[in-house]
C-alpha cells in the first residue's frame, strides 16, 4: 500500500524538476531595410521579425513589432539589407563529390567508405547552409547506402550544422541501368549507384525497405538515356510511397520517360530537359512539378565553352531552354534544384536561380521556385518557404535588390536557421 503514494510523490517531484529545468526561449528581433514577402513578391519596408526560440512570432514594421518584444530582446540590426526566407534546393546530392576523369563515378564508390562520404556530406551540408539554403531535398545518395539518413538525423540533433533535409536514400533503377560505369561484369558484388530492381514485386520491396530505413521520399529512374522502369513498376512505387505519406521524384529526360513517369503518378520530374509540349501539358493537368537542374549543365559546358558549338550539344541546350520556357508558359509549377554533385558546386546552389532567369523566368519566379513552390513540393508549406508567424525562423539577407538582380543571391551575407545565426557579414549597428 505504501508503493502508490511514493510513486505519486516521485511523479510530482519529477514534474516540478522538469518545469524548473525548462530554459526560457531566446527572443530575437531582426530589423532590416526591407523584407520580401511571399508569394506576393512585394517588399515590406522597415521590416521587423520577432523570433521566439526557433519560430517566427510576429512580422511587421520594426517599430510596431518592437512594442511586442520583451525588455530582454536581442536586436539584430541588418541596416538596409534585404531579407528573404531561407532558400530551398529540391535536388541535391550532398553525399557525392564525384571527381574528374574516366570512371570517376565508379572510383568514388569503391575508394571511399560510407563513413568518409558521410563526413564529406557534413562538410558540404555546412557549405550549402552558409550559402543561404536552409532546406534541401537530397534526391539519392549515389551508393552510400543510408548514410544520408545519418546525416539528416545528425543535423536534426545538432551534432553538425546543415540545412533541414529530406532524403531519398538509395534511389531505384532497373537492372542493367545506372550501374557503375566502366566496371567489369565479373565484379558482381561491386556497389551500385542505386538499388537495382526488376518487376513490380521487386519494386514494392525496395520502396518498403527504403522507407523502413528512413527515406523521406522515393527517387525513381524513369529513364537513363532510354526509358527503363515500366509504367507498372513505377505505379507500384508511387502506390507504396503515397500509402506511407512519401512523395516520388522521377529522373526523366526523354519524352517517353517523362510520359511514363507522369502516367504512373509521380510528384515531380527531375531534369526534364527533353520534355515536349505533350509532356508538359500532362504535368500541368496532373499537378506534377518540374525541377529543371540547369546550372549543373552550365557548369559542365563552362569547363570547355567550345563544346557548346557541337551540333548535338546545341540541340540539347535548345531543347532544355524550350522545355523551361514552355513549362512556364503552360503554368507548370517549377521548383529549384541545383543537382550539385561535385565538390566545387556545393555551396554554389544560387547559380540555379540565375540559370532559370537566363531561360526566361523573372527574378521573382526564380525566387518562388526556391521558396514557396519548393516548400509545397516538400509538403512543408507550414514550416518553411516564407517569413510568416509560426514558421521556422529561417532567414537570409543580401545587399541589393534580388527582384532587379537575382545574382545578389550568390553573395548571401546573413543566414539564420531556426533562430540561430549561422553567419552575419553585416557590420554591427
State what each model feature region is.
Residues 78-159, 232, 256, 260-264:
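Metal-associated gating/positioning segment near the N- to mid-region
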Amino acid at each position: 500500500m505504501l508503493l502508490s503514494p511514493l510513486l505519486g510523490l516521485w511523479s510530482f517531484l519529477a514534474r516540478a524538476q522538469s518545469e524548473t529545468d525548462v530554459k526560457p526561449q531566446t527572443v530575437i528581433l531582426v530589423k532590416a531595410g526591407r523584407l520580401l514577402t511571399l508569394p506576393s513578391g512585394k517588399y515590406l519596408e522597415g521590416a521587423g521579425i520577432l523570433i521566439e526560440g526557433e519560430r517566427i512570432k510576429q512580422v511587421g514594421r520594426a517599430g510596431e513589432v518592437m512594442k511586442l518584444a520583451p525588455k530582454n530582446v536581442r536586436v539584430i540590426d541588418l541596416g538596409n539589407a534585404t531579407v528573404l526566407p531561407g532558400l530551398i534546393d529540391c535536388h541535391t546530392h550532398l553525399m557525392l563529390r564525384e571527381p574528374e576523369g574516366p570512371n570517376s563515378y565508379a572510383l568514388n564508390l569503391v575508394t571511399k567508405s560510407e563513413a568518409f562520404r558521410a563526413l564529406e556530406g557534413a562538410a558540404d551540408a555546412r557549405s550549402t547552409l552558409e550559402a543561404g539554403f536552409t532546406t534541401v531535398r537530397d534526391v539519392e545518395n549515389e551508393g552510400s547506402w543510408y548514410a544520408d539518413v545519418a546525416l539528416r538525423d545528425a543535423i536534426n540533433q545538432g551534432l553538425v550544422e546543415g540545412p533541414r533535409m529530406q532524403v531519398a536514400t538509395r534511389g531505384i533503377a532497373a537492372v542493367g541501368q545506372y550501374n557503375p560505369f566502366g566496371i567489369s561484369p565479373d565484379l558482381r558484388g561491386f556497389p551500385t549507384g542505386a538499388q537495382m530492381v526488376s518487376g513490380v514485386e521487386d519494386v514494392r520491396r525496395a520502396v518498403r525497405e527504403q522507407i523502413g530505413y528512413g527515406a523521406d521520399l522515393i527517387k525513381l529512374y524513369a529513364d537513363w538515356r532510354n526509358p527503363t522502369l515500366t509504367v507498372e513498376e513505377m505505379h507500384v512505387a508511387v502506390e507504396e510511397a503515397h500509402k506511407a505519406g512519401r512523395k516520388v521524384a522521377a529522373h526523366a529526360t526523354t519524352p517517353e520517360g517523362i510520359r511514363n513517369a507522369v502516367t504512373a503518378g509521380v510528384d515531380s520530374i527531375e531534369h526534364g530537359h527533353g520534355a515536349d509540349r505533350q509532356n508538359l501539358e500532362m504535368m500541368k493537368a496532373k499537378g506534377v512539378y518540374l525541377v529543371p537542374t540547369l546550372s549543373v549543365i552550365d557548369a559542365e559546358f563552362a569547363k570547355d565553352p567550345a563544346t557548346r558549338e557541337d551540333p548535338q550539344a546545341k540541340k540539347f541546350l535548345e531543347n532544355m531552354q524550350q522545355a523551361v520556357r514552355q513549362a512556364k508558359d503552360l503554368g507548370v509549377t517549377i521548383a529549384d534544384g541545383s543537382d550539385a554533385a561535385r565538390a566545387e558546386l556545393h555551396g554554389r546552389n544560387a547559380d540555379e536561380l540565375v540559370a532559370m532567369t537566363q531561360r526566361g523566368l523573372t527574378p521573382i519566379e526564380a525566387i518562388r521556385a526556391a521558396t514557396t513552390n519548393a516548400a509545397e513540393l516538400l509538403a512543408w508549406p507550414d514550416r518553411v518557404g516564407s517569413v510568416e508567424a509560426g514558421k521556422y525562423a529561417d532567414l537570409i539577407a543580401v545587399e541589393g535588390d534580388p527582384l532587379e538582380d537575382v545574382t545578389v543571391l550568390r553573395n548571401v551575407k546573413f543566414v539564420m536557421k531556426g533562430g540561430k545565426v549561422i553567419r552575419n557579414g553585416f557590420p554591427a549597428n
